[in-house]
């Protein structure tokens, strides 16, 4: 994030597509034989959002690598797009799905999911989880609370 802030022509903002490309490049180094696909719409995102968003994506991809494909390797997809005044980020796989009866709000939920929910709260977003035997889908919807000052755009 710091590198992207330094390179950005908009103080305090990062280009989301570049940030996601770099994040996914680094994540691919720890995915073993899994295939990681990443895509993002081009948009500017405040550093206040980029840092927790990067941590959240890292945690969800790490969980997919650990648990989604117990029988071998598979695909994990990360996408980000702007919808109205919201950023929607999706992390999905086609693996085993979450354990039956899994409730992210229960105390027995993993530390990783507690980190995820902490980041969701920090981002003032909503997280929707869909899971079955064909995989899991985590959809984060967060408001875009700040934009760069239009008078400073080059």
Language model segments and positions:
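Short beta-to-alpha transition helix within the HATPase_c
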Residues: 4, 10-29, 81
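Conserved short strand/loop->alpha-helix "switch" segment adjacent to the catalytic nucleotide/phosphoryl-transfer site
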Residues: 28-75
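Short beta-strand/loop element within the Bergerat-fold HATPase_c
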Residues: 73-85
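Glycine-rich nucleotide-binding loop
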Residues: 75, 97, 132-139
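Glycine-rich/acidic phosphate-handling loop/turn and adjacent ATP-lid/helix
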Residues: 87-113
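Detector for a conserved hydrophobic position within an alpha-helical segment of the HATPase_c
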Residues: 120-121
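Glycine-rich ATP-binding loops of the HATPase_c
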Residues: 124-132
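C-terminal end segment of the histidine kinase catalytic
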Residues: 135-154
């Amino acid at each position: 994030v710091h590198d992207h802030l330094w390179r950005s022509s908009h103080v305090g903002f990062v280009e989301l597509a570049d940030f996601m490309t770099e994040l996914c490049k680094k994540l691919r180094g720890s995915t073993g034989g899994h295939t990681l696909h990443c895509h993002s719409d081009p948009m500017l995102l405040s550093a206040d959002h980029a840092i927790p968003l990067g941590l959240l994506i890292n945690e969800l991809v790490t969980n997919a690598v650990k648990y989604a494909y117990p029988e071998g390797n598979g695909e994990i997809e990360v996408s980000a797009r702007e919808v109205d005044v919201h950023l929607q980020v999706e992390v999905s796989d086609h693996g085993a799905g979450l354990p039956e009866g899994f409730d992210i709000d229960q105390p027995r939920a993993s530390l990783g999911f507690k980190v995820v929910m902490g980041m969701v709260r920090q981002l003032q977003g909503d997280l929707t989880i869909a899971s079955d035997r064909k995989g899991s889908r985590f959809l984060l919807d967060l408001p875009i609370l700040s934009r760069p000052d239009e008078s400073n755009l080059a």
